[in-house]
């Protein structure tokens, strides 16, 4: 394998984390450090767990970390919905972020399936 940096799902998840940092740098997030921190942590957790999983010695270990990444992605989606509902950003931003989260989730599902099938 060529390493985690070659995984498209890692690349997309990292790009999403960078986008989240940019979005949460301004506006209402300036005064809500709690939610901003939670959103950022969840966003960074996704590519971090993909990377850690890919570098593990066994597929079983890798899959465990990929599931953790999926969990962090669901956490991120929930927090983004809350941020939108309390007026931190508009629906267009939410839809864009949700679409990317769904793509990453599908890619993680495929990666889990592929790595689970390898013995």
Residue ranges of each PLM-predicted region?
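Short, C-terminally biased terminal segments at protein or domain edges
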Residues: 1-119
């Amino acid at each position: 394998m060529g390493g985690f940096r070659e995984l498209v799902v890692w690349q997309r998840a990292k790009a999403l984390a960078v986008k989240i940092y940019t979005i949460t740098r301004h506006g209402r997030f300036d005064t809500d450090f709690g939610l901003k921190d939670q959103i950022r942590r969840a966003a960074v957790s996704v590519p971090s767990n993909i990377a850690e999983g890919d570098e593990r010695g066994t597929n079983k270990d890798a899959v465990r970390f990929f599931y953790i990444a999926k969990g962090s992605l669901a956490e991120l989606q929930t927090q983004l919905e809350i941020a939108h509902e309390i007026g931190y950003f508009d629906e267009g931003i939410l839809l864009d972020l949700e679409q990317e989260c769904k793509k990453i989730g599908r890619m993680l599902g495929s990666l889990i399936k592929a790595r689970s099938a390898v013995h």
